[in-house]
């Protein structure tokens, strides 16, 4: 399986997944992981990706344009529109059966939010699954994204390293 992680912190993803069992799995070709830096898709000279929520509200959200542009780049790279999992505390709780369902995909995009979340317009355009790893809030979706990636290696259908 190929994981494509959309994040503001690509080093956090790659450092976390390139170690231990997942690191060996990546080296052995059992799985691949590419982290996309959403900031690289900002058209702002300061690479700003946050803004006030469209329609008002408290806090800041990730802007729709950089998120959607990043996704479109992934689509161009793999040649199809893959399943997109948005890691959010408001999502369905991640389960073993969900891991098995995701494992049927050749490519899985995981979208990591920050701030108060992501502009709803981006979520409506690209997200297929809203997933949570528990009933608590973290500062971003990177740790949940790594948890989803790790579970792929525990499935009976996954080649052992």
Which residue stretches match the model-derived regions?
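Short, structured active-site "lid" loops
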Residues: 49-69
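S-adenosyl-L-methionine/SAH cofactor-binding core of RNA-modifying enzymes
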Residues: 63-114
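Short beta->alpha connector loops at strand-helix junctions that form conserved
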Residues: 112, 130-141
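Short, glycine/polar-rich helix-capping loops at beta-to-alpha or helix-loop-helix junctions
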Residues: 116-123
